[in-house]
Amino acid sequence: MPDVPWIEKYRPRKLSEIVNQEQALEKVRAWIESWLHGNPPKKKALLLAGPPGSGKTTTVYALAHEYNFEVIELNASDERTYNKIARYVQAAYTMDIMGKRRKIIFLDEADNIEPSGAPEIAKLIDKARNPIIMAANHYWEVPKEIRDRAELVEYKRLNQRDVISALVRILKREGITVPKEILTEIAKRSSGDLRAAINDLQTIVAGGYEDAKYVLAYRDVEKTVFQSLGMVFSSDNAKRAKLALMNLDMSPDEFLLWVDENIPHMYLKPEEMARAYEAISRADIYLGRAQRTGNYSLWKYAIDMMTAGVAVAGTKKKGFAKFYPPNTLKMLAESKEERSIRDSIIKKIMKEMHMSKLEALETMKILRTIFENNLDLAAHFTVFLELTEKEVEFLAGKEKAGTIWGKTLSIRRRIKETEKIEEKAVEEKVEEEEAEEEEEEERKEEEKPKAEKKKGKQVTLFDFIKKN
């Protein structure tokens, strides 16, 4: 495969080169030009919403090239904490030292912003001095505080004709011919995702047309985790198994839990099961190193081990395969918002109780039992951990959450009363010390004339003796 990915090599450098999004681009131009004319729009953020591969990210970079902006790109999936995002945004408030280039702050995957951090990011948007552009596949999954402050620009899904035309233009520039039926199949399987179609085309051209059936057979942009597991456990072909995580909306560490849970249900012989567990053990080591060092290129080796490594471990059971969700997290039953709330609770436990993530996870399970059975104690934990109403509801359920929240109000009121008493005591102490200092000063002032008078009497006595 060529060194340079075609998706980057042939990325449009002008807005006019973007495929079939004229209506959206018209709004984008009007918005950015209001910044350039010194009259920032009322909504200082722009939200590009639409399906994958429709041109959202390409729009940002074409816009920057055409209007001479520098892009500072962040990803909500990676830079989730407010402090990190705030640091980048703060750094971008001013222009370069020479003042030649302005900056566009680009936050990709805005539909992955944690709800707990949304209010603070909204404040950053309010005080922004540079354009902020966000991209999301699902508009309604962007937190409301962010949506309310952003101008919405909707991108439509590209049709097969649009995708094929773009692929043909690339092939002409490469001087390559590909059978029409393969181009049609690529466009069909892409579901309007031009980025995915270009990647598939480059893979097929590099590997030969005999690989086309494998690449295209597993192209499913909305693939579920069950389909991904099927690709790992129903194949003994390492090359095909590696495609399991392609376009799956799940991190490698989460997918590893699913693979781990299902190995006992899929393998017949103990020695084969052991080989599969050895593969995911190595994957876990790579993931841990990536997390500790920040070197996420190690993910590639982890993914290879948890997919290809497991696939070639031995003979799987024949027939229909029923897959099971991980018991530890029960991720199947949780929506993305619920996972976000769960992660927020775990972080608060780690911070306030000085625990590791694993310890915090176990503690959260205990807290769930407490919140379901001891509402008074639950209220105290709520105040101690500074839990939100949604987090209380996550731990206790809707019926009990309201009662617990009501109890926290009285606890907070008592805390405030105690704080007021303590503040008053401190103030009284300060006033008492100040009064004592004033009395001491007054006493010193009163003693000065006496000392001087005494000194005067000594001189007079000396003179008297001298005279006599």
Swiss-Prot record:
Organism: Pyrococcus horikoshii (strain ATCC 700860 / DSM 12428 / JCM 9974 / NBRC 100139 / OT-3)
Chain sites annotated for binding ATP: G50, P51, P52, G53, S54, G55, K56, T57
Family matches, as NCBIfam families: PRK04195.1-2 (NF003227), PRK04195.1-5 (NF003229)
Molecular-function GO terms, alphabetical: ATP binding; ATP hydrolysis activity; DNA clamp loader activity
Keyword ATP-binding among UniProt keywords: yes
Keywords: ATP-binding, DNA replication, Nucleotide-binding
Alphabetized HAMAP family for the sequence: RfcL
Protein name: Replication factor C large subunit
Signal peptide start-end: none
SUPFAM superfamilies: P-loop containing nucleoside triphosphate hydrolases
Keyword Nucleotide-binding listed: yes
Region (Disordered): 422-456
InterPro entries: AAA+_ATPase, ATPase_AAA_core, P-loop_NTPase, Rep_factor-C_lsu, RFC_lid
Family designation: Belongs to the activator 1 small subunits family. RfcL subfamily.
UniProt-listed GO biological process terms: DNA replication
Quaternary structure and partners: Heteromultimer composed of small subunits (RfcS) and large subunits (RfcL).
Protein role: Part of the RFC clamp loader complex which loads the PCNA sliding clamp onto DNA.
Compositionally biased intervals (Acidic residues): 429-444
Pfam families hit by this protein: AAA, RCF1-5-like_lid
